[in-house]
């Protein structure tokens, strides 16, 4: 039972489960004389146990959908349809009985309503802010409940693993193009459009298609693929973190806010020195963002009026950063010319050849 229920406010519990190598780790069954589906057994150390699911709990909702009047098979189908993560709203027998006596329908909204009432209570301002921070953290946790990488472990069958790998020209990485029905890949939870992060514990970030295929083949008849779906991939990119096996059940990173990203970029811009040599400047502008490219297009108009001088001691780094190709070649030519040895006087040449 939750702390609130013990304090006299009976509430259901929301359990977020991530499927492990052996499934979720709980058994569902119906009881004679009772309506609904119940948790019969929770395996030790399983995702179900970690989520707080208890034997004897009655299942009320699956991913926000009420299942109280559904058959055993219908509930099982809903859980399977969620693939590798599921959200279960449950009540223990005591809480269930209390809510029935009060005539309160059991819904996930009960938890949200309780959080709101705690947040709007009129104790001291510091306590209110603390409750608000906890509420925000819990909400953020629920939103990120399914945004984790997945470890898909599979053994090769008679027809292989049963998935196709491909690369997408529009984005880096290797992706799952298709998963064969009833294949080891499907049984492991692998899905089409998943991006491969690790193969058998080795990071595949930045690797070519052939490297990933070789890494899978090197595993023999078994492969462990750490993958992310599209939403999870975008979440980790916002956090500027590469997904790893630590994120399977460990703490998740926090996304960067726009202000933090802008601050980070501006700091990098101040720290990075501008090269005075033409080649590095041009190479850097080729990988710059759109605004720098627009500045580079305007730069010839600014430089046409003033001819570059080889005797100038130093030039503005910003102007060097945006110089045109023609100006860069001219400066390079002048720099080479300035390093040539001075011409020898003709009389000295004549004297030298006479001595020889």
From Swiss-Prot:
Region Disordered, annotated ranges: 113-142, 265-356
Matching InterPro entries: EBP50_C, NHER, NHERF-1/NHERF-2, PDZ, PDZ_sf
Membrane topology: Peripheral membrane protein
Places the protein is found: Cytoplasm; Apical cell membrane; Cell projection, Filopodium; Cell projection, Ruffle
Domain of life: Eukaryota
SUPFAM superfamilies linked: PDZ domain-like
The keyword Cytoplasm belongs to this UniProt entry's keyword annotation: yes
Keywords from the UniProt entry: Acetylation, Cell membrane, Cell projection, Cytoplasm, Membrane, Phosphoprotein, Repeat, Wnt signaling pathway
A molecular-function term among this protein's GO annotations: beta-catenin binding
GO biological process: actin cytoskeleton organization; adenylate cyclase-activating dopamine receptor signaling pathway; auditory receptor cell stereocilium organization; bile acid secretion; cerebrospinal fluid circulation; cilium organization; establishment of epithelial cell apical/basal polarity; establishment of Golgi localization
Residues modified as Phosphothreonine: 290
Disulphide connectivity of cysteines: none
Residue(s) carrying N-acetylserine: 2
Domain PDZ: 14-94, 151-231
Annotated Basic and acidic residues bias: 346-356
Low complexity: compositionally biased ranges: 272-288, 307-317
Description of how the protein assembles with itself and partners: Homodimer, and heterodimer with NHERF2. Binds the N-termini of EZR, RDX and MSN. Binds the C-termini of PDGFRA, PDGFRB, ADRB2, NOS2 and CFTR. Binds ARHGAP17, EPI64, RACK1, OPRK1, GNAQ, CTNNB1 and PLCB3. Binds PDZK1. Interacts with CLCN3. Binds the C-terminus of PAG1. In resting T-cells, part of a PAG1-NHERF1-MSN complex which is disrupted upon TCR activation. Forms a complex with CFTR and SLC4A7. Forms a complex with SLC4A7 and ATP6V1B1. Interacts with TRPC4 (via the PDZ-binding domain). Directly interacts with HTR4.
Task of the protein: Scaffold protein that connects plasma membrane proteins with members of the ezrin/moesin/radixin family and thereby helps to link them to the actin cytoskeleton and to regulate their surface expression. Necessary for recycling of internalized ADRB2. Was first known to play a role in the regulation of the activity and subcellular location of SLC9A3. Necessary for cAMP-mediated phosphorylation and inhibition of SLC9A3. Involved in sperm capacitation. May participate in the regulation of the chloride and bicarbonate homeostasis in spermatozoa. May enhance Wnt signaling.
Name of this chain's protein: Na(+)/H(+) exchange regulatory cofactor NHE-RF1
Source organism of this protein record: Rattus norvegicus (Rat)
Lineage of the species this protein comes from: Eukaryota, Metazoa, Chordata, Craniata, Vertebrata
């Amino acid at each position: 039972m939750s702390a609130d229920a013990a304090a006299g406010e009976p509430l259901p519990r929301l359990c977020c489960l991530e499927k492990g190598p052996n499934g979720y780790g709980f058994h569902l069954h119906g009881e004679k004389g009772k309506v609904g589906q119940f948790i019969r057994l929770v395996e030790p150390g399983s995702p179900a146990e970690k989520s707080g699911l208890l034997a004897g709990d009655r299942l009320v909702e699956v991913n926000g959908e009420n299942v109280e009047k559904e058959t055993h098979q219908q509930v099982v189908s809903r859980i399977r349809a969620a693939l590798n993560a599921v959200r279960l709203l449950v009540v223990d027998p005591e809480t269930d009985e209390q809510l029935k006596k009060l005539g309160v329908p059991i819904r996930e909204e009960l938890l949200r309503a309780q959080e709101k009432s705690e947040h709007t209570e009129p104790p001291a301002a510091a306590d209110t802010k603390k409750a608000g921070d906890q509420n925000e953290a819990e909400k953020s946790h629920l939103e990120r409940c399914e945004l984790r990488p997945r470890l898909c472990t599979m053994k090769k069958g008679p027809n292989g693993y049963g998935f196709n790998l491909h690369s997408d020209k529009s984005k880096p990485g290797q992706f799952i193009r298709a998963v064969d029905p009833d294949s080891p890949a499907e049984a492991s939870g692998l899905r089409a459009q998943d991006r491969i992060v690790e193969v058998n514990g080795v990071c595949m970030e930045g690797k070519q298609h052939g490297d990933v295929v070789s890494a899978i083949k090197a595993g023999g008849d078994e492969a462990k693929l750490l993958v992310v779906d599209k939403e999870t991939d975008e979440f980790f990119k916002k956090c500027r973190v590469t997904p790893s096996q630590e994120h399977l059940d460990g703490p998740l990173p926090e996304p960067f806010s726009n202000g933090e990203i802008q601050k980070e970029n501006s700091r990098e811009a101040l720290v990075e020195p501008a090269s005075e040599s033409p080649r590095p400047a041009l190479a850097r502008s080729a990988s710059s963002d759109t605004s720098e490219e627009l500045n580079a297009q305007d730069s010839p108009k600014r430089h046409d009026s003033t001819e570059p001088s080889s005797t100038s001691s130093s030039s503005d780094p910003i102007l060097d950063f945006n110089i045109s190709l023609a100006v860069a070649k001219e400066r390079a030519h002048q720099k080479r010319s300035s390093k040539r040895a001075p011409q020898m006087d003709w009389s000295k040449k004549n004297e030298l050849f006479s001595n020889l």
